[in-house]
């Protein structure tokens, strides 16, 4: 039985086999000093107290006390892998980025898949958006495409992000997941309807990480060598085919194998079944953006493919598992502001907010020198700047080079040729309310044209099955929003909720007391 286990289960066995006849390494302290006894503490006599001079114990325990680093506030549960991106189609007319330089070019990549709301020990099979972040190690520095498995998101204004995440996390008093919090926020922000509908559809629970698409989601800007710019969106579609889990299978796996997605990815790569995705872009000119029927930078909407077709670019291939999870996955940090020349941000409000939030959280979680950690290091570019010192400075701190700019001593110089693309911006400065920017048209298309009848049925069942645990006034607000999308959408959900709500008194838990004779009649009636 043990001989037929999968590579993930046999990791220790395989590690030993790889060492072949090598002798075991000499056991040492963190400082490299050999250890003579690792099984017994040093004491004054067999029953005496420990000695402070037992540096073997203190070295071990002091490090153990500091093993954990802060958990990611979102996307805490994840799996990672490494591979390459290969260009298959020329898009240099759109972008001068070296990653797209010529057909056949390969760029090393690191990828992290994740759920959003759960903690690091949560199940892989919950209904939740999936993170799908790609780090390209280019000659012009890292490019971090920090995407999801959906082309849209719940909100379009970055100031709402902390509250949105709080609503998906645990109640501050009970420390329980709270349907009131979840649905209260969603019902008060109807721009969430598109993503909520996607989330509760069949694609809300992907079958592992290999069978789902990825999307940059945001609108970006591409700039070519002539300084001409267009807006774009990034898509990466699975070559393994879309597969999703049923509600029943997902629930079963959450108990039987909560690490189902991580295990599936590891074993596929370990057995040479390398997963891949075909990489595409959509392109919109500036003039098209000006006449577009809605805000092209709205993260709650897509660009219709019939108007802005997918343009093939290349392939993402994953062919190496992490050597060590903590070193290469837990410490992996993605930052949307890492963009090499040829790729720039658009005015997308959510993207603009992430440009600050992501590097800020990495500095908190990993330290100000997190880009010196090997998995985050832009190893194909030479880093030269005026940043110095700080906790965990692990490199040479740029030696004796000047640490101020400008200077007269041949230190790193700015390069005018990589200046960002200029753009016009002269509107009034104020806080613009975007809450009611057509929250239903694309959701209606998704409900009526993208989904089939059986898919619509399951969508409504999934929504009602979750919404039923929220208070009635919240249910009413949510149903109103779904009805605004289409009367049939709201009516189906309401009909299912009516059944659930009718069953609630029957399923209520009653507490009975054996000795109630001393209670008043009113108190007895309340038992």
Curated annotation (Swiss-Prot):
Q: Where is the protein situated, by its record's location annotation?
A: Peroxisome matrix
Q: What is the effect of changing residue 327 to T?
A: In acatalasemia; heat-labile
Annotated region Disordered: the residues are: 1-34
UniProt motif Microbody targeting signal: location = 524-527
Q: PTM N6-succinyllysine: list the residues.
A: 13, 221, 449, 480
Q: So what EC number does this one have?
A: 1.11.1.6
Provide the catalytic activity annotation. Answer: 2 H2O2 = O2 + 2 H2O
* InterPro entries attached to this UniProt entry: Catalase, Catalase_3, Catalase_AS, Catalase_clade1/3, Catalase_core, Catalase_haem_BS, Catalase_immune_responsive, Catalase_sf
The UniProt entry, under Pfam families, shows:
Catalase, Catalase-rel
Co-factor requirement: heme; NADP(+)
Primary location class: other
Binding residues for heme: 358
Listed under GO cellular component are:
catalase complex; cytoplasm; mitochondrion; peroxisomal matrix; peroxisomal membrane; peroxisome
> Per the UniProt entry, what are the Gene Ontology biological process annotations, in alphabetical order?
aerobic respiration; cellular detoxification of hydrogen peroxide; cholesterol metabolic process; hemoglobin metabolic process; hydrogen peroxide catabolic process; negative regulation of apoptotic process; positive regulation of cell division; positive regulation of phosphatidylinositol 3-kinase/protein kinase B signal transduction
- Point out residues bearing the modification Phosphoserine: 9, 422, 434, 517
Give the quaternary structure: Homotetramer. Interacts (via microbody targeting signal) with PEX5, monomeric form interacts with PEX5, leading to its translocation into peroxisomes.
Provide the protein name: Catalase
Organism field: Canis lupus familiaris
> Which gene is this protein's source?
CAT
